[in-house]
């Protein structure tokens, strides 16, 4: 088994890491940063991912997708999805199966398909660093993700060309990273994870058992639709209201203005973590018949806190429930770990400190800890690391609907996984030939108030009075937190394996089609990158040869000059077309035409009479390109991004 990388697929930013020896390496992307914006843009038949997508978001808001993780595994009619529709500039559409998808240029895309583009970027980042192909990964998800959301995340990995060896919960991954440097003694930690789109809290016990670190999750709770994006939205709503009050113009319907507001709000929020006030200044935000309008608003830290205090307070409820479920008191918590970029907000830190009665630790990087923990779990799965044991739990109760529409639990929340539990059911009518079982996940007593995972039918039950058939149904949750069901008719001994026919999610055929699409795009991307490379080579060669001709004008005959200039013209014409081989051929023709000239130049200079390699003229241009890459990467990034999107 090769390296198993760890990927934190975040709502706002993503991160990739790998275990090297006994240390975790957070891998920098092609732009030189350790985290990558979880943004995907579709522009002129090109897919941009990360920073390049973020840079053009203001001018392409309808085709720039961000916070797609909030839609993964969700139904279009979910209240939280309906709320998001009014908050994002891109179109959220209803798929044929009722799922929430997005629509770009009239084409519907599934959230796992979009998330796969981010995973591909992470995969390529790791491959560039390791110098080898990467096919296996551990991917993290919010602890409170349900079965559909976990399966959709695995689908995204599959589309990206990754075998997702394990799905692990984000707070658990952060605890693994924290525990790496904590070698002695037992401790109980609370992981408070407030990311871009989700909130989780987990109570985790770390024990030293015969030299092996054992991480046991005692309880977890959270909210999969509460995060930094909501803090941004609260600030955006305030700015829109202030502008309406000042200019009597509503910016809500202007997608370009709203995208500029989003960027400004995010920037202001970050600045207010260290400053007491900041100014949002957006000239020419819009215009009407009276002329252009400018938005200038000064925001204080206290104003931001008043706008978002309710959001912070919402995180306290899950903290209380997690402690109760774990059966421990606040005083039993040894350390509090903050994870997720939103925890940098002073108000969040203050409220967490007040709740747990202690200052949270500052030695865990909130942006990188989750990816680091995923990399540690990857090393465990590959056999590279053997002194860590992870015992996680299922965050939500699993059960079925019984008479009266009540949810009958089969596996209670916070049950350690993997696990398998069974319960015996029977028929409700005489001679009933089949039973239909509705499977739900959630904490509500009324079955249909929970997330329906699907249904299955057990058929061919022999005729018998009601209540007599004994049908044992087993719920089996694997280490990823994903469920399978089997059933046995105890009267006949007939066993049957049941696959949940989910009402939502991608079918195997859809996933396979998306993989084929990704592979086709990969070929196109590679062709585009190769074409760009050979065009750059042609451009550099033409420049170098023209300079040499000018410098050696007195040594070159008219025939030689005409021959070289004709070759240059043919190469310039070829470079405007899309034929890679033709450009290469014209490059070679220019080299051959220039060879007699180069021999003259170097003979006169006392160099070897064998002539020079025309590529030497190109060397300076190549080196110049390398030196620029570390600066602004405005030019180079476009080509880098194409390579990053190889599928």
From Swiss-Prot:
InterPro entries, A to Z: ATPase_NBD, Chaperone_DnaK, Heat_shock_70_CS, HSP70_C_sf, HSP70_peptide-bd_sf, Hsp_70_fam
PROSITE patterns assigned: HSP70_1 (PS00297), HSP70_2 (PS00329), HSP70_3 (PS01036)
Any one GO molecular-function label of the UniProt entry: ATP binding
Highest taxon, organism lineage: Bacteria
Known role: Acts as a chaperone.
SUPFAM superfamilies reported for this sequence: Actin-like ATPase domain, Heat shock protein 70kD (HSP70), C-terminal subdomain, Heat shock protein 70kD (HSP70), peptide-binding domain
Positions carrying Phosphothreonine: 198
Upregulation: By stress conditions e.g. heat shock.
Residue stretches of biased makeup (Polar residues): 615-628
CDD domains: ASKHA_NBD_HSP70_DnaK-like (cd10234)
Name the UniProt record assigns to this protein: Chaperone protein DnaK
Region Disordered: start-end pairs: 606-634
UniProt KW Chaperone keyword: yes
Family under the similarity heading: Belongs to the heat shock protein 70 family.
Alphabetical UniProt keywords: ATP-binding, Chaperone, Nucleotide-binding, Phosphoprotein, Stress response
């Amino acid at each position: 088994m090769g390296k198993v990388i760890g990927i934190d697929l975040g709502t706002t930013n993503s991160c990739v890491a790998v275990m090297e020896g006994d240390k975790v390496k957070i891998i920098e992307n092609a732009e030189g940063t350790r985290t990558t914006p979880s943004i995907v843009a579709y522009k002129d038949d090109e897919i941009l991912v990360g920073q390049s997508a973020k840079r053009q978001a203001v001018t392409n808001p309808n085709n720039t997708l961000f916070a797609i993780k909030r839609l993964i595994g969700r139904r279009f009619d979910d209240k939280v999805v309906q709320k998001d529709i009014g908050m994002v500039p891109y179109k959220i559409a209803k798929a044929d199966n009722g799922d929430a998808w997005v629509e770009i240029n009239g084409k519907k895309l599934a959230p796992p398909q979009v998330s796969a583009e981010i995973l591909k970027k992470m995969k390529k980042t790791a491959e560039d660093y390791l110098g080898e192909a990467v096919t296996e990964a551990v991917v993290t998800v919010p602890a409170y993700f349900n079965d559909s959301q976990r399966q959709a995340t695995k689908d995204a990995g599959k589309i990206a060309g990754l075998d997702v060896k394990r799905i692990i919960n984000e707070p658990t991954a952060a605890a693994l990273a924290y525990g790496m440097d904590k070698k002695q003694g037992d401790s109980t930690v609370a992981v408070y994870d407030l990311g871009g789109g989700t909130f989780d809290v987990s109570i985790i016990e770390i024990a030293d058992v015969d030299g092996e670190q054992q991480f046991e999750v005692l309880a977890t709770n959270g909210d999969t639709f509460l995060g930094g994006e909501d803090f941004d939205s609260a600030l955006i709503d305030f700015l829109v209201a202030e502008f309406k009050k000042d200019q009597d113009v509503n910016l809500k319907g202007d997608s370009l203005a709203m995208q500029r507001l989003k960027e400004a709000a995010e920037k202001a929020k970050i600045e207010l973590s260290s400053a007491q006030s900041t100014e949002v200044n957006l000239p020419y935000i819009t215009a009407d018949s009276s002329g252009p309008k400018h938005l200038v608003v000064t925001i204080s830290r206290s104003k931001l806190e008043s706008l978002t205090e309710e959001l912070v307070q919402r995180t306290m409820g899950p903290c209380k429930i997690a402690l109760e479920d774990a059966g421990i008191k606040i005083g039993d918590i040894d350390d509090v770990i903050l994870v997720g970029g939103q925890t940098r907000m002073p108000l969040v830190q203050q409220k967490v400190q007040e709740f747990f009665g202690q200052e949270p630790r500052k030695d865990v990087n909130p942006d990188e800890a989750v990816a680091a923990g995923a990399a540690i779990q990857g090393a465990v799965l590959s056999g590279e690391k053997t002194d860590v044991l992870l015992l996680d739990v299922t965050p939500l109760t699993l059960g079925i609907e019984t008479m009266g529409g009540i949810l009958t639990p089969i596996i209670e929340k916070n049950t350690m996984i993997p696990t398998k539990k069974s319960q015996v059911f029977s028929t409700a009518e005489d001679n009933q030939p089949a039973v239909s079982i509705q499977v739900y996940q959630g904490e509500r007593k009324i079955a249909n108030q929970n997330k329906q995972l699907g249904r299955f039918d057990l058929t061919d039950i022999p005729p018998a009075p009601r209540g007599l058939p004994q049908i044992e149904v087993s719920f089996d949750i694997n280490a990823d937190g994903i469920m399978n069901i089997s059933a046995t008719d105890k009267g006949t001994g007939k066993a049957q394996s049941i696959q949940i026919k989910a009402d939502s999610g991608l079918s195997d055929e859809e996933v396979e089609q998306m993989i084929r699409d990704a592979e086709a795009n990969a070929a196109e991307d590679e062709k585009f990158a190769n074409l760009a490379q050979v065009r750059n080579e042609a451009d550099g060669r033409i420049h170098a040869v023209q300079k040499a001709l000018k410098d050696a004008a007195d040594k070159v005959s008219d025939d030689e000059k005409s021959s070289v200039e004709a070759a240059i013209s043919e190469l310039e014409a070829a470079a405007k077309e899309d034929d890679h081989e033709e450009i290469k051929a014209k490059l070679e023709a220019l080299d051959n035409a220039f060879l007699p000239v180069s021999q003259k130049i170097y003979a006169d200079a006392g160099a070897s009479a064998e002539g020079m390699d025309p590529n030497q003229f190109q060397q300076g241009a190549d080196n110049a390109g390398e030196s620029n890459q570390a600066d602004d990467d405005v030019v180079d990034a476009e080509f880098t991004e194409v390579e990053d999107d190889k599928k």
